[in-house]
Amino acid sequence: MRFFTEIKPLKTYVAEQKREGKIIGFVPTMGYLHDGHLSLVRKAKLQADVVIVSIFVNPLQFGPNEDFAKYPRDLERDLALLQEEGVDCVFAPSAEEMYKEGFSTFVEVNGEITEVMCGKSRPGHFKGVATVVTKLFNIVTPDLAFFGQKDAQQLFIIEKLVRDLNLNVEIVSVPTRREEDGLAMSSRNTYLNPEERKAATILYRALKRGEELVLAGERNPERLKKLIEEFIKTEPLARIDYVEVRSVPDLKAMDVIKGKFIIALAVYIGSTRLIDNFILEVD
């Protein structure tokens, strides 16, 4: 497994692989890998000849009072896991390598898609995501890039970015990996104490409840949101950031639930903010 911390030698490596006609699969991560990340890697292994994983906790996508400093990091453990999965190459740059002194160019996807849900709760977050992803795509020049559906809003924004800017990469989305009790796998789950960890299943249970209501015929998005909110409030440790029901993939508000749509949640369990979603379809 090759390991790079600098852009230049990585680009040389990628150019060699391309000369040999190999298909490059890319999995961008912030490290502290769990089975959700590894499911992206496994999918990449199936579809690409060479799999490159990046590990970079991107300072641009964290707000001033967010968890950038305490975001979990363990490069040694991550590298061992990736080696085990048969990854070809890992790129783990420093912030200084990615954002050279005087860096002042940003990529921004505008419109409702970045203004609602996490865009509303975390201003500037998706500007940071779009900028780093564009940089990584330019550095790695992958044929395929793999993203998890757990971060559905991020996934839809990146798909739009690729479409709008004619980037030469195919985005592959991979279903959310869950713990046995339904909790979506996330590096931030490590912040939860045992009591909070138990309480955190409220997100998955609330989504299941929402799905049941839709299957039973509920088509009013406002009423569905209310019922899900009431359900979440039965958990004393939970504090709702948002519950949204929107069309997919443009994340527009709906008057009536039809076609492909998302039920998306952001909920604080203690001081930890967790997100989850179901993507559903009705006639």
From Swiss-Prot:
By its UniProt entry, which Pfam families does this protein fall under?
Pantoate_ligase
Q: What class of enzyme is it?
A: ligase
Gene Ontology CC entries for this record: cytosol
| Keyword Methyltransferase recorded | no
Q: Catalysed reaction per UniProt?
A: (R)-pantoate + beta-alanine + ATP = (R)-pantothenate + AMP + diphosphate + H(+)
Highest taxon of the lineage: Bacteria
Residues annotated to bind (R)-pantoate:
61, 154
Q: Where in the cell is it found?
A: Cytoplasm
Q: Does the keyword Transmembrane helix feature in the UniProt annotation?
A: no
Gene Ontology terms: biological process? pantothenate biosynthetic process
Q: Which residues form the active site?
A: 37 (proton donor)
Q: Which residues are recorded as binding beta-alanine?
A: 61
Keywords, comma-separated and alphabetical: ATP-binding, Cytoplasm, Ligase, Nucleotide-binding, Pantothenate biosynthesis
- What EC designation does it have? 6.3.2.1
Pathway noted in the entry: Cofactor biosynthesis; (R)-pantothenate biosynthesis; (R)-pantothenate from (R)-pantoate and beta-alanine: step 1/1
Q: Which InterPro entries match?
A: Cyt_trans-like (IPR004821), Pantoate_ligase (IPR003721), Pantoate_ligase_C (IPR042176), Rossmann-like_a/b/a_fold (IPR014729)
The GO terms describing molecular function are:
ATP binding; pantoate-beta-alanine ligase activity
Binding positions for ATP per the UniProt entry: 30-37, 148-151, 185-188
NCBIfam families from the entry?
cyt_tran_rel, panC
Miscellaneous comment: The reaction proceeds by a bi uni uni bi ping pong mechanism.
Function according to Swiss-Prot or TrEMBL: Catalyzes the condensation of pantoate with beta-alanine in an ATP-dependent reaction via a pantoyl-adenylate intermediate.
Record's family? Belongs to the pantothenate synthetase family.
Quaternary data: Homodimer.
Q: What is this protein called?
A: Pantothenate synthetase
Which species does the entry assign this protein to? Carboxydothermus hydrogenoformans (strain ATCC BAA-161 / DSM 6008 / Z-2901)
